[in-house]
């Protein structure tokens, strides 16, 4: 993952703020890899020295995400999930993001990587106890995420993207559903990048993703991806 190596070098030289947001080093990129090869460097690149950071869904995160996240040496890094996982350097909190157990404006930056699509759906694959399913759960979750983000703070979200579909344990977003999510957040969109898997990952347009399905185009998992960076407004009337 070349971009993560680039970020690591910036970290060691104290220059994380100048590293810049993720850009595909080549197209196609990550042939034979899942959407994680995009999401992880994209999310990590959004960190600009914030003190209090929350990662939602950390307990089931891959080591290839947790390792670079921890390498950022974030002063106060919290993890929220339905189950506990002991990770040195992360303050574990067990809870439901739809009822986040944090005060208003608690965090400078919140990361929600391939997690939002599972909220409100059948999570027994990750969590033994079945929760009540709620197709609007993601909208409730994003409102809570916005609430616990400080004004002027930022939110990073990645979700599978293409044709809207309920797969039972997660939903794939389309333009309409993602716009509803962003609207519910009440935040400003700083950046939105779309990607499609076609013998590797490439930048894509909305039109190119309209009919993309999960595991389509011989993808190992998602064949379409949306990465969004939001900012909570500084003023209540924005």
Regions of interest found by a model, annotated:
Residues 118-123, 134:
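A short His-aromatic
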Residues 136, 157, 162-181:
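Acceptor-substrate binding/catalytic loop of class I
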């Amino acid at each position: 993952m070349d971009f993560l190596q680039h970020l690591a070098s910036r970290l060691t030289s104290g220059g994380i703020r100048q590293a810049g947001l993720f850009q595909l080093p080549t197209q196609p990129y990550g042939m034979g890899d899942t959407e994680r090869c995009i999401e992880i460097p994209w999310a990590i690149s959004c960190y600009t020295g914030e003190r209090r950071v929350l990662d939602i869904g950390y307990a089931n995160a891959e080591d290839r995400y947790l390792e670079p996240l921890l390498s950022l040496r974030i002063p106060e890094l919290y993890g929220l999930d339905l189950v506990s996982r002991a990770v040195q350097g992360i303050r574990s909190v067990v809870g439901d993001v739809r009822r986040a157990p944090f005060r208003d404006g608690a965090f400078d930056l919140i990361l929600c990587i391939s997690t939002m699509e599972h909220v409100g759906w059948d999570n027994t694959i990750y969590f033994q106890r079945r929760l009540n399913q709620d197709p609007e759960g993601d909208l409730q979750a994003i409102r809570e995420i916005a609430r616990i983000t400080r004004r002027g703070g930022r939110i990073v979200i990645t979700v599978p993207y293409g044709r809207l579909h309920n797969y039972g344990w997660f939903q794939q977003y389309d333009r309409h559903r993602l716009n509803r999510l962003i609207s519910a957040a009440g935040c400003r969109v700083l950046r939105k990048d779309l990607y499609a898997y076609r013998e590797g990952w490439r930048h894509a347009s909305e039109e190119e993703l309209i009919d993309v399905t999960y595991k389509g185009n011989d993808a190992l998992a998602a064949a379409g991806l949306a990465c969004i960076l939001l900012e909570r407004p500084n003023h209540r009337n924005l």
